[in-house]
Amino acid sequence: MSFHWVDILIIALYLGLSIFIGFWISKKAGQSIQNYFLGGNKMKWYYLGLSNGSGMFDVSGTAWTVTILFVYGLQSVWIPWLWPVWNQIFVMVFMAVWLRRSGVMTGAEWITTRFGSDRGGRLSHIIVVVFAVISAIGFIAYFFVGIGKFVVTIFPWDLSFSLGGVTFINEYVYATILLSVTTLYVIRGGMYSVVATEVMQFLVMVVACVAVAWFAMDKVTPEQLDAAVPEGWYGFWPTWDKGIDWTGIFDAVNDKIASDGYGMLGALVMMMFFKGIFSSLAGPVPGYDMQRVFSCATPRDAAKMSGLTSLILYPPRYLMVAGLGVLGLVFVTPVLKAGGGEIDFEKILPWVINHMLPAGLRGLLLAGLLAAFMSTFSAFVNSAPAYIVNDLYKRYIRPDAPAKTLVRASYFSSVGIVVVGIIFGFFSESINSLTLWITSSLYGGYVAANMLKWIWWRFNGYGYFWGMVAGLAGSTLKFIFFPETPDIYLFPLIFALALAGSFLGCLLTKPVEEETLLSFYKNVRPWGWWEPVYRKAKALYPGITRNGDLPRDSVNVLVGIVWQMTLVVAPIYLVIRRWDGLAVSLALFAVTSVVLKFNWLDKIKDYEQV
């Protein structure tokens, strides 16, 4: 198809504005790496919240979410618990305050405040750096696959070429160009450019999401949708049997469900909840979410920023997802059935944009999805090099390096991470395979050690190191010996192996030095098994108080998970015109918002200085 000049103009204006803002604000970033990576801790929490929400609104994730809504209906809202999406609630309720009180720049630097600088502390520090860089490379590959699948069926120009006997297909060429353009302004302006462009990009995304939802509601009647979906598609609660049966409507979808491993969704949700509790207690992984927390001016601002992220992210995103999913069910299904052969459900999103949307709206949505891609990608490109520069180069190679040298090193490390991520993207099969690898296997090795570091005073750097190594080894063995088993079902085994490594590594070595533990507890004040440290701190600092917020935090987490779910389902109910479901979700949103207002927001506090 050919693009209308209006669509081209909208996309060109958006790209030009993004690059202009990124370069225009970049002068502040070069003053120091504190400015480059954290914005000097001077940016407002609501801008950081908008930036964080924008960074989580990615094209690959949107394409995947449209696909699972198409296949699983309302029950699909449970599947993102794989991450789990509600780890943001744990961060909002208590983890953001704990993290920000440390006053550091990266997760690896934070590890030093917890475990010290002895051999165990250095080992734990290094493995966090390795994990952060590997995670970033994995996500960049994930973005590479997603944006390639997306643009190749929309942009009409064939950019494929051959070089040295190797053919670079359209998907790879488009993805490489978009990654390169985004990397350019991120490298130049650091955190300032990332946040400024992401705020603008978020506004573009909101307009696009509302427009798509309105268009879908105008084009699809409830009767058309009823005829296009099987029995159970509107059901919210996960089932314990084989799930939705598409037989006679679209038989190929049953094969998709079988290959995903999401058939018995009820059992899967129980596994995801089990995994999610421990994953969330581990805290955010070393990445852009943690970087936004470290960038806030105060611990209270960090908590409010994390709460704002969920509030502004889910309603517009799921308006778009529901709109595109409904259009796909009614208008794309006949095309997919007629095509025969192997069906790539991850191309539902591009097909709807290509064939359904009118000029102007198509350009607006493309600008919005490009904004989603660029904001998410830029967040990773800005956060990962901090670990290379601050935690490797500055710490071990040139501790006395001037600010300009460190910023320049950040440029080179950003380019290196992007290049390696693109290379990995060439070898991944699909968005879903990368999603499962990142969430269930790679992060499975992360959970045990990072949970224990918060809640148990005796845990040390050796335990952290060997816990991470054991977990990552378990994840690797899974791919060798159980490649066909869904990753989520093997999480308990990987988690148990990581726990064993953590306890053995810890109990066979000496505890963290008392001075380090006292400093950490005095500053961070987590709840958990900290009684011996608290007693010693009380003797030194009579004014210190114990953190007794565990009961209230637990209630707020449960309320927050329900609150977050209402933000997901309400837009879907609106687009599919299920008014009873919409009314219930809005009522629950109102009730949970009031509870969080009085039991969380009004009680966020920084601890006294002692």
Question: What do the PLM-derived regions correspond to, one by one?
Answer:
Residues 1-610:
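Membrane-embedded helix-loop-helix hairpins and adjacent transmembrane boundary segments
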